[in-house]
Amino acid sequence: DLTFSKQNALLRAEYQADYKSLRFFTLLSGLLNTHGLELNADILGTDKMNTAAHKATLRIGQNGVSTSATTSLRYSPLMLENELNAELALSGASMKLATNGRFKEHNAKFSLDGKATLTELSLGSAYQAMILGADSKNIFNFKI
């Protein structure tokens, strides 16, 4: 669907597919108005026990550009999740990423964030895991 009016333009496209026990769904949408442009994507795939999903947004406006995305996978006994947020504006840029995963008794987490402005530059990350009975952890911070 594509809709135009004096105030905005809307876009929406939806797709579905089924095959045996598998189901797929996709939704793409967008909005253009005086505040800017926003695009969204939602994707989902499932069967009786497992799920994979992705959701993303892109915004372009007077204040800058931002994006976010979330992805998850559950395929028993495996579980993965990822989340990303980023922004670029006249005042600077920032980004955050968080990822974690689990397979039976094993797990790992990772995060990364950064920021850049006219007066500051920073980067940080953290890693923590329990794999094959061994604990590990690493933290990194950098700032100017």
From Swiss-Prot:
Superkingdom, taxonomy of origin: Eukaryota
Alphabetized InterPro entries for the sequence: Apolipoprotein_B (IPR052418)
Keyword Secreted: yes
Tissue: Detected in liver (at protein level). Highly expressed in liver. Detected at lower levels in jejunum, duodenum and kidney.
One cellular-component annotation, GO: very-low-density lipoprotein particle
Cell compartment(s), UniProt: Cytoplasm; Secreted; Lipid droplet
GO biological process terms on file: cholesterol homeostasis; cholesterol metabolic process; cholesterol transport; lipoprotein transport; triglyceride mobilization
Keyword Lipid metabolism: yes
Main subcellular location of this protein, as a coarse class: cytoplasm
GO MF, one example: low-density lipoprotein particle receptor binding
Keywords, comma-separated and alphabetical: Cholesterol metabolism, Chylomicron, Cytoplasm, Heparin-binding, LDL, Lipid droplet, Lipid metabolism, Lipid transport, Secreted, Steroid metabolism, Sterol metabolism, Transport, VLDL
Purpose: Apolipoprotein B is a major protein constituent of chylomicrons (apo B-48), LDL (apo B-100) and VLDL (apo B-100). Apo B-100 functions as a recognition signal for the cellular binding and internalization of LDL particles by the apoB/E receptor.
Quaternary structure annotation from Swiss-Prot or TrEMBL: Interacts with PCSK9. Interacts with MTTP. Interacts with AUP1. Interacts with CIDEB.
Name the UniProt record assigns to this protein: Apolipoprotein B
